[in-house]
């Protein structure tokens, strides 16, 4: 279980040896295992995820991408579909990579393939989330497909081109307009803005 306490960033080689020893010591004390991993640090990346649907018969399609770069305390706050500031060539690579990864493992479910994209639009793979994500609704808004409904039908054995799902090819999935989702979080301004709980006492639908 990775938390922000488990992550360290160092930009100078001369800091590395000391940081390495400290990180191993902390890991050993906290988890009983002093194994650590070193990764390339990507400064100010975009967090981009590609929505995937795959059935039991080898058919897999993407439903374009979401930009989840606006985050606070390592938690997503704003999600936008599609990503508003990526080149189309970069988006096409993201789709290609997402499909290649999921086709290789014969993926059959709704899922999300997550990437980081740096300022030069180099792409780095993070992980595959084999489930529905909270932000799937922005993808539903711009594609018109009910991802939750499709997932249930896939689990029941339906193919993507079945009457219940009606995705006959990648070309059937069109992206229209933009959708934005914002999450409401609670923080205590009198306690250094630490995460807090609260009660919603009023709600007004725009």
Where are these regions (language model features)?
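ATP-dependent carboxylate activation and anion-phosphoryl transfer catalytic cores
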Residues: 1-206
């Amino acid at each position: 279980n990775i938390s922000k306490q488990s992550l360290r960033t160092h930009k100078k080689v001369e800091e590395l040896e000391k940081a390495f020893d400290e990180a191993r010591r902390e890991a050993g004390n906290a988890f009983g295992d002093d194994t650590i991993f070193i990764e390339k640090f990507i400064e100010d990346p975009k967090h981009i995820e590609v929505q995937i649907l795959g059935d039991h018969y080898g058919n897999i399609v993407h439903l374009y991408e979401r930009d989840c770069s606006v985050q606070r305390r390592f938690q997503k706050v704003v999600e936008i579909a599609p990503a508003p500031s990526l080149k189309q060539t970069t988006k096409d690579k993201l789709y290609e990579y997402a499909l290649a990864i999921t086709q290789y493992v014969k993926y059959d479910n709704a899922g999300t393939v997550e990437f980081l994209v740096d300022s030069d639009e180099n792409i780095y793979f993070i992980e595959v989330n084999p489930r529905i994500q909270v932000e799937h609704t922005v993808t539903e808004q711009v594609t018109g497909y009910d991802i939750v409904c499709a997932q249930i039908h896939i689990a029941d054995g339906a193919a993507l081109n079945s009457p219940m799902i009606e995705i006959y090819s990648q070309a059937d999935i069109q992206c229209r307009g933009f959708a934005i989702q914002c999450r409401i979080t609670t923080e205590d301004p009198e306690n250094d803005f630490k995460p807090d709980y609260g009660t919603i006492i009023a709600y007004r639908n725009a």
